[in-house]
Amino acid sequence: MSAGISHVPAAQVSQHVTVLLEEAVEALSIKPDGVYVDGTFGRGGHSRKILEKLGAQGRLVALDRDLAAIQAAQGIQDARFKIVHSHFAAMAQVLASLNIQQVDGVLLDLGISSPQIDEGERGFSFRFDGPLDMRMDQSRGQTAAEFIATATEQELTRVIKEYGEERFAKQIARAIVAQRAGGMDISTTGQLAKIVAGAVPKVEPGQDPATRTFQALRIFINQELEELSLTLPQCLSLLAPQGRLAVISFHSLEDRIVKRFIRGEQDRDNLPAHFPVRASDLPQPRLVAIGRAVRPSEDEVRRNPRSRSAVLRVAERTAVL
């Protein structure tokens, strides 16, 4: 096990603080009788706030692929609320099964929750030694340990570089393969963190050398960017006119996808200025960005340091088909 790996009981550290709570829910411009989707229930901070603003005829459907989140949702006894064990890329299918064709707002909080980070047995963090799992949904799919055990050096390099934006990806991949060749079964977060620390020649101030590698593996194992890319067009199709899409991202890879999607739907008439066509014949925007990207206040970052990289983008559905 690497130095610095903590064995603090999860119960002592896993309190989740919802990021941009007021800002995200306000951005949805809740209608009392509206239908809303919380695509990432987590520990329910956003869902509870939405329910506070809904009237008796309102409705909220929440999704999460983490079984611990589904269990946490059982504490909400409200006829207006429905929790579904599902990844948000299946949103359209889930809503269809509930006979919901249109919604007035969708919220996606793409961040990993504090309990997921702080519970060592989940395998998300280099701070707490535990099985190298990293699956959001522990009932299915390949674990990080299984991927590391079989991936080639080239595959490891690609994943760590592409999803972690790690400049030392090649050195880290080489070190993993070398340890594997030497007979090591890399099955814990502590083992991996130690290998990465030994492979990285230069560490950014204030950042653990394993940060980017753990991010990369988590994103890859859970197909987070692919899920997001599949989900955004569904949100567009599901939103009623004047419906709102609010997305909180936590790193540039996610934010880039969200930003490009909104911009692509807003700037559909991106033809050359003197192109011979009437303005009325140009494709009209189906989404319009609402305000600028919102970031946590200094006070929120002080209270919850994990919020510091959060970015909230909001867009509104137009009446254009």
Swiss-Prot record:
Q: Name one GO molecular function term.
A: rRNA (cytosine-N4-)-methyltransferase activity
Positions annotated to bind S-adenosyl-L-methionine: G44, G45, H46, D64, F88, D109, Q116
Gene3D superfamilies, sorted:
Putative methyltransferase TM0872, insert domain, Vaccinia Virus protein VP39
What are the EC numbers? 2.1.1.199
GO cellular component: a single term? cytoplasm
Q: Which SUPFAM superfamilies match?
A: Putative methyltransferase TM0872, insert domain, S-adenosyl-L-methionine-dependent methyltransferases
Recorded catalytic activity of this chain's protein: cytidine(1402) in 16S rRNA + S-adenosyl-L-methionine = N(4)-methylcytidine(1402) in 16S rRNA + S-adenosyl-L-homocysteine + H(+)
* Major site of localization recorded for this protein: cytoplasm
Q: Where in the cell is it found?
A: Cytoplasm
Instruction: Give the record's keywords alphabetically.
Output: Cytoplasm, Methyltransferase, rRNA processing, S-adenosyl-L-methionine, Transferase
- The residues that cross the membrane are none
GO BP term, pick one: rRNA base methylation
Give the function comment from the record.
Specifically methylates the N4 position of cytidine in position 1402 (C1402) of 16S rRNA.
Entry similarity comment: Belongs to the methyltransferase superfamily. RsmH family.
Q: What is this protein called?
A: Ribosomal RNA small subunit methyltransferase H
